[in-house]
């Protein structure tokens, strides 16, 4: 794919780690695995991917993805096969296996639904790490409570600690600064910020109602977390500031 080729060339030029991938992006895992096999550069890069959490949209993954031991082992093995490698440097849980507010939800409203206990998930990840298939574990789209629960159980039970969290962070989404930043600093859980350009709003390509062909907001219309009027106003003010300074 032309875009992936450009990304790989940038990684080689600037010595970036390989951008984190995910089980939900299996075709991209295959592209990266094929590239590693062709170039022999696997050991030169940090390789990260994620296991999908529960979501009816992904019913085709493992019969409905959860973070049980059986399912995580299946997910890891699938990613290893697509990536054509024997070890993943950083393995992350893509979103929580419980009902909570993530993916742009601002308020928390409790709802009872099936969930895999965090300790069960951590013990499954411990077995996977000890098997040599994964070097380190991380979280994604997680809350301060969830992150601290993982850390508390790890410290109390002698289980692997999470090393990173991949949450959104940009000029348009600074929710990470509310509690999560302190958790990261005090507990040594590094941030891998995603969506730093607010799904492209901060590039200016959507200015004046433009919807470029093939852009994220056209291809993924259901992703509406940056669709609020206040968000568009803030983006425009940032873009005007950039224009004023020639950047």
Segments from the language model and where they lie:
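Glycine-rich, proline-tolerant flexible connector loops at the mouths of alpha/beta enzymes
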Residues: 13-35, 97-105, 109
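Single conserved hydrophobic/aromatic residue that forms the stacking wall/gate
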Residues: 1-12
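Short, acidic/polar
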Residues: 9, 67-82, 118, 122-123, ...
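Active-site mouth loops of central-metabolism enzymes
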Residues: 58-73, 107-116
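Conserved beta-strand positions
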Residues: 13, 49, 90-93, 139, ...
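Beta/alpha (TIM)-barrel catalytic core signal, keyed to glycine-rich beta->alpha loops juxtaposed to Asp/Glu
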Residues: 96-247
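Structural motif corresponding to the early beta-alpha repeats
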Residues: 39-66, 94-97
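Acidic (Asp/Glu)-rich catalytic clusters
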Residues: 33-46, 81-84, 129, 151-160
């Amino acid at each position: 794919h032309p875009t992936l080729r450009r990304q790989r060339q940038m990684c080689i030029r600037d010595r970036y780690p390989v951008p984190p991938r995910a089980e939900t992006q299996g075709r991209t895992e295959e592209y990266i695995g094929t590239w590693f096999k062709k170039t022999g550069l696997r050991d030169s890069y940090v390789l990260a991917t994620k296991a999908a959490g529960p979501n009816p949209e992904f019913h085709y993954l493992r019969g409905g993805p959860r973070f049980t031991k059986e399912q995580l082992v299946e997910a890891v093995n699938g990613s290893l096969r697509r990536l054509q490698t024997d070890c993943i440097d950083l393995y992350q849980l893509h979103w929580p296996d419980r009902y909570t507010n993530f993916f742009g939800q601002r308020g928390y409203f409790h709802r009872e639904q099936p969930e895999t206990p965090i300790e069960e998930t951590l013990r499954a990840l411990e077995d996977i790490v000890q098997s040599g298939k994964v070097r380190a574990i991380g979280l994604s789209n997680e809350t301060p409570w969830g992150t601290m629960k993982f850390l508390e159980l790890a410290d109390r039970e002698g289980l692997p600690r999470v090393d990173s969290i991949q949450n959104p962070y940009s000029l348009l989404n600074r929710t990470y600064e509310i509690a999560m930043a302190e958790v990261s600093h005090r507990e040594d859980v590094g941030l891998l910020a995603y969506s730093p350009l607010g799904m492209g709003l901060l590039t200016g390509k959507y200015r004046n109602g433009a919807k470029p062909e093939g852009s994220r907001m056209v291809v993924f219309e259901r992703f509406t977390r940056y669709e609020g009027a206040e968000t568009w106003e803030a983006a425009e003010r940032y873009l005007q500031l950039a224009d004023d300074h020639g950047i």
